[in-house]
């Protein structure tokens, strides 16, 4: 008999590069499965985002269908929309439903306003760093 009911999360992976990174789908699924195992999460098969640039259709469908599960486990937080308004809209929708998004590679999760701010700060840094002067330029 289980002492506690596991939370149920749907995986979310990419079939295209994201933020100049490319990870094979089977590797993304291995990382998500391992993350779920370590965190006592029941892993539901991953949904794969369409390959078209900037597509978020599958992510939006996952968010719309969160009523039956506890949340989403994405391979990386950098698979969320790069556009600030779009990404924040996804995060706001998840939080308004009292659900969670976990990011397996970074070991982070979004479940309240504090984690929301933390994740957005990391996004700001990631987007700003390429525009900073390097030692080679100085």
Spans of model-derived segments:
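Short, structured surface patches at the beginning of a domain
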Residues: 1-138
């Amino acid at each position: 008999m289980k002492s506690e009911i596991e939370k149920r999360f749907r995986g979310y992976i990419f079939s295209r590069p994201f933020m100049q990174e490319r990870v094979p789908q089977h590797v993304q699924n291995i990382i998500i499965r391992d993350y779920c195992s370590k965190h006592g999460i029941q892993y539901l098969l991953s949904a794969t985002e369409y390959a078209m640039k900037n597509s978020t259709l599958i992510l939006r469908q996952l968010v719309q269908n969160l009523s039956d599960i506890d949340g989403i486990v994405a391979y990386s937080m950098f698979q969320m929309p790069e556009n600030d308004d779009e990404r924040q809209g996804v995060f706001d929708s998840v939080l308004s439903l009292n659900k969670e998004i976990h990011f397996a590679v970074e070991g982070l999760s979004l479940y309240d306003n504090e984690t929301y701010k933390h994740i957005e700060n990391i996004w700001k840094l990631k987007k700003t760093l390429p525009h900073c002067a390097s030692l080679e330029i100085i």
